[in-house]
Amino acid sequence: MDKEREKQVYLARLAEQAERYDEMVEAMKTVAKMDVELTVEERNLVSVGYKNVIGARRASWRILSSIEQKEESKGHDQNVKRIKTYQQRVEDELTKYALTLSVIDEHVVPSSTSGESTVFYYKMKGDYYRYLAEFKSGDDRKEAADQSLKAYEAATATASADLAPTHPIRLGLALNFSVFYYEILNSPERACHLAKQAFDEAIAELDSLSEESYKDSTLIMQLLRDNFTLWTSDLEEGGEHSKGDERQGEN
């Protein structure tokens, strides 16, 4: 392995252990720009870094949004204004990180030779544009949703051709794509169809499931089934959140 690449991967590992995820992302972006095919470990370092920097800010945004609603109900207009300003800072950070995902299109995907890696990266891109669509509005929301849809569709095309229905990455993709249809495109019927199809196809090939991915695959299958049940029984009320990637573990 090239010495600079080895150094950056080591720094990313250090940053992960020190929980300095912003620096972890920067180190792995440097590796990605070398236009080399990433190893499974490197791929996971990219994913963990982004998941943490974006996940933390996403959680912050939701907390601020909840506080804003409470202050609004009490008529505390000045506090609402302060919260909105603070929330905008978090949104700007989220946007900045999601947009650095261009490194996936420009460097990582072109260097990938396996279907598994291609699905992994497009799924990741779809996830993060979905996160942007959660808090954007107007044309910005539409743009984020369009980018997310394209990435999920590209991932699905490759997954259908190259990965078994029981593969945890293919199942994780179906889980998150169905959540996208339900929560971003407000299309519960499409979400239900996608979740049920992925679950049924995996069940049909359960006997061929490898021992190493059994736990991950069956967990995601359970989440697919839970969402399908939730969405079909609660379409009228629509008050519950879907079980998406936060609970599916690494895949």
Swiss-Prot record:
SMART domains: 14_3_3. InterPro entries: 14-3-3, 14-3-3_CS, 14-3-3_dom_sf, 14-3-3_domain. PROSITE patterns: 1433_1, 1433_2. GO terms for cellular component: cytoplasm. It holds the Pfam family 14-3-3. It comes from the Eukaryota. Most abundant in roots and flowers. GO terms for biological process: protein localization; signal transduction. Belongs to the 14-3-3 family. PANTHER family: 14-3-3 PROTEIN. This is 14-3-3-like protein. It comes from Nicotiana tabacum (Common tobacco). The lineage of its organism: Eukaryota, Viridiplantae, Streptophyta, Embryophyta, Tracheophyta.
